[in-house]
Amino acid sequence: MAEYVFSDAPKDSHGNGVKDAVPGKQPEELPPAPRYFQGENTAGFMRPVRFEGDITNLEVVGEIPKSIEGTFYRVMPEPHLPSFIPNDPWFNGDGNISGFYFKDGHVDLKQRYVRTEKFVREAEARRSLLGKYRNRYTDLVEFKIRSTANTNIVYWRGQLLALKEDSPPYAMDPETLETFGVYDFDGQLPSLTFTAHPKFDPVTREMVCFGYEAKGDGTRDICYYSFGPDGKIAETVWLVSPVCGMIHDFAVTENFVIFPIIPLVCDVERMKQGGDHWQWDYSIPMYIGVLPRRGAQGSDVKWFEAPHGFAGHVANAFEDDKGHIQLQMAYAKDNVFFWWPDANGKGPRPGEVEAHFANFVLDYQSDKLPLAEPTYLVDDDMEFPRIDDRVATRKHKHTFFCIFDRKPGVTDFEFVMPRAGGGAPMSNGLAHLNHETGDIQRYLPGPRKLTGECIFIPRNSEAAEGDGYVMVLLANYEDMCSELAVLDTKDLTNEVALIKLPVRLRPGLHGNWVDKSDVDGHPAPL
């Protein structure tokens, strides 16, 4: 428990919020703050509820299998106070953590905001202070740790880590969801930034990590590092990327780490003028860096050049019999984050871009850096792929992912769209791909419901890969409340249980399952 950086805790570092943040500036000198939420990104289902509390024994339709015992943690970006930035992006909301605690066929909910420096100081000031997404030059006061802690929540050595890729993690209590403070791995964190997608090797029990813009905004520095099960840092490699681009997710195999760069580029001078941190660049490829996982130097990285496109979330990567890397991920041919267009304002319209499940083949021994088009594993418009984590970094047979099925009748768009609000991606179903047989099962929750990212839970520790349950949070636009569906992978098309929430939870980004049987919060390998 000595690994929490209490010296960086917001209240201790900054005293009485606004007045101490910028010498000579008093709260009354700040521009007026809005008193209510405005714009489509905080309308309809996206309107912040700002709920914190405990709900015991949630309503259940059907039966939750009693073998399901553990906790489903998820995080959503939800502004605690109205932003002074007009129609602030969904990504800039405060991290609000859900814990669904399962035991004996029952489930309880706990909901807490992460007490980041931003959250604490804005609560004290009773107004928004943080400016544009990842642009510190637009803040009303100076922040030491600018994180919103709103992207992912993972379990590590007895605590939760709330993650945002521009900052160090925040540590939380897994049972109470109390925030402990900024976490720097007992002084070992080498980078200013920490990925929102660390990978957990089920065999070595390592947490494999990286930070991009690792020396600050606009820097091309990447720091790759890993921590062993004893909490000690095991690998540290500094490397330089071809561009200062977004690296939201990455992949890990037994012997390599892989860094796909989204062609959204940062320019600090643009930021200083009040512009966005990110701007799409149609002139560059989608770089994919490959680095040996053990004993590497920065010069060992190879930057392959994939056809221009958007690197979405990674399902997994593994090495085949030839030693080639098979990288499986969501991939789009244009800018998924359309609200950050190119320098001329060019970009796709909302909902125009589709992402598909792509397989890239990477040969580290080859000097041929341009890559051909990937192969596509399914026809669905998809995102947020998940696997059975017991086979992570090795060849997998099953993938579960969100789909967006545009066929008539699947979703009642005439009813849903006026109630949806804006800013968050849409999916209206899930799919389960069996890579060995090519079979696909699909789950469609109904014409007035949308789905979030799913998680997979093994039926038991000895179950075959992909045999178990899938959980997914649903947005019910008829009742304007949330539901948690439990599905059996033997028949993904029907719910075995539907858990009804008396509150509305905004669309979230990521979540993870911690099973009661997991000794260190992560499953044993198959």
Curated annotation (Swiss-Prot):
GO terms, biological process: carotene catabolic process
Keywords: Dioxygenase, Iron, Metal-binding, Oxidoreductase
Gene Ontology molecular function, alphabetical: carotenoid dioxygenase activity; metal ion binding
Pfam families assigned to the protein according to its UniProt record, in alphabetical order: RPE65
Signal sequence residues: none
Stated induction or repression of this protein's expression: Expression is induced ba resveratrol but is not dependent on light.
Binding-site residues, piceatannol: 133, 164, 383
Cofactor(s) needed for function: Fe(2+)
EC number: 1.13.11.-
Function: Dioxygenase that cleaves the interphenyl C-alpha-C-beta double bond of resveratrol to yield 3,5-dihydroxybenzaldehyde and 4-hydroxybenzaldehyde. Also cleaves piceatannol, a compound that differs from resveratrol only in the occurrence of an additional hydroxyl group, which leads to the production of 3,4-dihydroxybenzaldehyde and 3,5-hydroxybenzaldehyde. Is not able to cleave trans-stilbene, 4-monohydroxy-trans-stilbene, 3,5-dihydroxy-trans-stilbene (pinosylvin), trismethoxy-resveratrol, and 3,3',5-trihydroxy-4'-methoxystilbene-3-O-beta-D-glucoside. Is not involved in carotenoid metabolism.
Protein name: Carotenoid cleavage oxygenase 1
Organism: Neurospora crassa (strain ATCC 24698 / 74-OR23-1A / CBS 708.71 / DSM 1257 / FGSC 987)
Species classification: Eukaryota, Fungi, Dikarya, Ascomycota, Pezizomycotina
